[in-house]
Design a protein with these regions (language model features):
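Active-site-proximal helix-loop-helix substrate-binding element of RNase H-like nuclease domains
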Residues: 7, 14-16, 20-113
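Mixed-charge, glycine-rich, non-catalytic linkers/tails in nucleic-acid processing enzymes
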Residues: 21-24, 76-77, 81-161, 262, ...
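Active-site cores of enzymes that catalyze phosphoryl transfer or operate on phosphate-rich substrates
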Residues: 236-283
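Proline-aspartate-enriched helix->loop->beta-strand connector
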Residues: 1-7
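A non-catalytic, amphipathic alpha-helix used as a structural packing/dimerization or gating element
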Residues: 104-119, 247, 251, 297-304, ...
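DNA-dependent DNA polymerase catalytic subunits
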Residues: 126, 130-218, 223, 259, ...
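Carboxylate/His-rich catalytic cores and anion/metal-binding grooves
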Residues: 7-8, 203, 255
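Conserved phosphoryl-transfer catalytic core
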Residues: 219-232, 237
Length: 522
């Protein structure tokens, strides 16, 4: 968090001492811009230099951690951490080091620098930033910027065709397009469930059906245009996005062949951003006919694929956006791989034949046999018999040995950072026993006994993010906000600086006295 912590602190020190913060080349000043939204968040521009913020860069590269603090990320990736990891004790110890042991303070600071550098080195983050910048035209230290990146790739191609793009103030909103298609699930515990997954579904739809801003303008004038949705029609000849995606697709395949994972990831993120860009009012090409012709086509493809599979006497128990979950059952043990591979091949062939007939296009849809769950659980919605959505768990075999397996959880407590460690661990062990046909009743009773005997207090800690300033929580004051306010009151009495006034993460427990911050638990 170099911008909003390190550099902001240095700026405040300079202000206090009436110094100019000259960090740029040629003694140029650092330039600050306050974020339009966010708790005291700033952007920093340093002339002639690039500032790479590790947190923002890792989020851009789709890393996911419960906590993006240097201590947590370094423990996860490097298996080592800061020399002092307790927030409050760290402040006291740093002050003591400054006053009594400056070499020790230097060691502490140097280790922080080593941790950051080693994370960047291990994960190739600088290479990712360079590849992303080369691909999108964005500055190395600009994060997000999908619309600007789209303009960088699309506008020159549009201009070479002799067209000028509309200005943002010329846009009109024409309703809302739906999101991805999510099927109603059939709850239960199953044997042998396979997942068939469309490879990059939305980019494939754009290529197949010529979804494109220029193609839309031209297609509305043509009699033989490819039909879209909500009045959209797309030219068979004049389209830029399909060609652009084809080039990116080829480049990604080449990057994979060259084992260039960094470039492959950058290209994937770029291709997958096109749908979102076309659906935002911040894009000069925004038109619901474009977006709905992608999402509604996705709905149509998912429903038709489900029907194709069920006509072959296999049950589809769930589907979500680009994935279909197919039940094979215990009788197919030993044939799962063969069935999954054949189903995917048959479905790809069927789509090629169908789309060649109507609307007369080449199909770039590609479904793959992705995962085999030897055991699979689709839960019900709490308090209902209806199947849930975006929540499931399964056991995947990774080898032939007894212990060669892994558990996969989606949307359940075990993968939610705002649930306690006990809840997550309990769910993992319980599901593991159920999937492996092991007894679980005594385990449940044992956990309940130990819980009532207060053996799990450290595992009952909850962790949640404060997304606004504490003072901004007025009408609705959830438990984690109450805990943060208690923590700030205790810190104020002890003469400690504020920790949560501007947001952040809070760890707390639910007690008979209400929510209490973990670090000040009585």
């Amino acid at each position: 968090n170099i911008v909003n912590f390190d550099l902001r602190c240095l700026q405040k020190f300079c202000d206090r001492l009436n110094l100019v913060f000259k960090l740029g080349r040629n003694d140029e000043n650092i330039i600050w811009r306050k974020a339009a939204q966010g708790n005291d968040r700033f952007y920093a521009l340093v002339p002639g230099r690039v500032i790479l913020d590790g947190i923002e860069l890792m989020r851009t590269a789709t890393y996911s951690f419960e906590n993006f603090s240097l201590e947590h990320v370094s423990r996860q990736l490097l298996h080592r951490g800061k020399l002092v990891d307790d927030v409050d004790e760290r402040g006291k110890e740093i002050t003591d080091l400054f006053e009594n042991n400056k070499p020790g303070l230097a060691r502490y600071n140097l280790e922080d620098c080593r941790l950051v550098w080693d994370i960047f080195e291990k994960e190739n983050l600088i290479a990712f930033a360079i590849e992303r910048s080369s691909l999108t035209g964005l500055e190395l230290d600009r994060y997000g910027g999908s619309v600007a990146a789209f303009d960088y790739l699309y506008l020159p191609r549009l201009h070479r065709k002799g067209f000028v793009a509309p200005a943002l103030d010329q846009l009109e909103s024409r309703g809302v397009s739906p999101g991805g298609y999510v099927m109603d699930s059939i709850p239960g515990i199953y044997d042998n469930v396979i997942v068939l997954d469309f490879k990059s579904l939305y980019p494939s739809i754009i290529r197949t059906f010529h979804i494109d801003p220029l193609g839309l303008i031209k297609g509305l004038e043509e009699t033989d245009a490819i039909p879209g949705f909500d009045g959209g029609r797309f030219s068979r000849e004049e389209a830029l996005l399909p060609e652009l995606i084809e080039k990116l697709w080829t480049a990604r395949d080449q990057a994979k062949a060259n084992s260039n994972a960094v470039l492959s990831q950058a290209i994937k993120l770029m291709m997958n951003s096109f749908y979102g860009v076309l659906g935002t009012l911040g894009c000069r090409f925004f038109d619901t006919r474009l977006v709905s012709s992608i999402t509604k086509r996705g709905h149509e493809i998912m429903i038709a694929s489900r029907d194709f599979i069920e006509q072959r006497d296999y049950q589809v128990i769930y589907g979500d956006t680009d994935s279909v979950f197919v039940l094979l059952g215990p009788e197919c043990e030993g044939q799962v791989s063969e069935i999954g591979t054949k189903l995917a091949a048959d479905l790809n062939l069927w789509w090629r034949e169908q789309l060649a007939q109507s609307p007369g296009v080449n199909s770039y849809l590609e479904i793959e046999f992705e995962t085999h769950y030897s055991k699979f659980l689709m839960p019900t919605v709490r308090g209902s018999d209806a199947g849930s959505k975006k929540r499931y768990a399964g056991l995947v075999r990774t080898g032939t040995g007894r212990d060669d397996y892994g558990l996969i959880f989606k949307g359940l407590e075990s993968v939610r950072s705002d649930w306690s460690q006990l809840a997550r661990h309990f769910q993992q062990v319980l599901y593991e026993r159920v999937f492996l046909d092991q007894p679980y009743e005594e385990y449940v009773k044992e956990v309940v006994r130990d819980l009532l005997d207060e053996k799990f207090e450290d595992e009952l800690v909850l962790r949640k993010r404060l997304r606004r300033k504490l003072v901004d929580y007025v009408k609705n004051v959830p438990p984690h906000v109450q805990a943060a306010r208690k923590a700030e009151a205790i810190r104020a009495e002890s003469g400690l600086p504020t920790l949560y006034d501007s947001g952040g993460w809070i760890e707390y427990l639910i007690t008979v006295n209400g929510p209490e911050p973990r670090q000040y638990r009585q």
